[in-house]
């Protein structure tokens, strides 16, 4: 990371990943070209992250031959005029992680992954989860991304006095 003063620890980065409305997952396709998609991921152990989709498609084909992925999450993204110098800038919280994607084949783990996604994005509707699973499990692909190293975090944020919060300083 070029600006070490903005680096944050892996626990902080995991918090960003849990709060981000989506996480961009980047793959390398069969031709060696980058392929990034914003996906709705969820995890209950901070190591295994799940997403779901159709049983066919480009990302599933890519995973079979190139399972290595990079995840990028951003929260609190706010265009800002620098309080001290009037510069145009952006306040943000971000996380980067690397992992290995695998298509889940066991129904029990598919249900576990889908439950994590449901609890994260639709907790108020979990009473309908079992019915939804009964209807759609056989036509839903679930992918597990296992992080291969702790995520890294980066932040640019100003405090109430307009001073940039550096070197992990918290509010």
Regions found by a protein language model. Give the residues of each.
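Short N-terminal helix-initiation segments at or just after the protein's N-terminus
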Residues: 13-14, 33-49, 81-94, 125
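Short nucleic-acid-contacting surface segments enriched for D/E, G, S/T with interspersed K/R
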Residues: 63-65
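Beta-strand-connecting loop/turn residues
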Residues: 46-47, 67, 148
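Histidine-centered metal-chelating micro-motifs
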Residues: 56-60, 70, 78-79
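Short beta-strand segments
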Residues: 20-55, 71
């Amino acid at each position: 990371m070029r600006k070490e003063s903005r680096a944050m620890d892996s626990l902080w980065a995991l918090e960003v990943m849990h709060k981000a409305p989506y996480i961009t997952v980047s793959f390398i396709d069969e031709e060696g070209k980058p392929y990034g998609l914003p996906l709705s991921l969820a995890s209950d152990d901070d190591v295994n992250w799940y997403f779901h989709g159709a049983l066919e498609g480009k990302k599933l084909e890519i995973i079979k031959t190139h399972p290595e992925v990079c995840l990028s999450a951003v929260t609190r993204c706010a265009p800002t005029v620098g309080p001290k110098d009037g510069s145009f800038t952006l306040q943000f919280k971000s996380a980067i992680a690397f992992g290995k994607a695998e298509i889940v084949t066991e129904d029990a783990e598919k249900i576990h992954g889908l439950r994590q996604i449901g609890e994260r994005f639709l907790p108020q509707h979990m009473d309908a989860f079992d019915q939804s699973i009964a209807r759609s499990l056989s036509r839903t692909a679930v992918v597990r991304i296992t992080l291969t190293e702790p995520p890294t975090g980066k932040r640019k944020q100003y405090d109430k006095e307009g001073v940039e919060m550096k070197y992990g300083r918290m509010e």
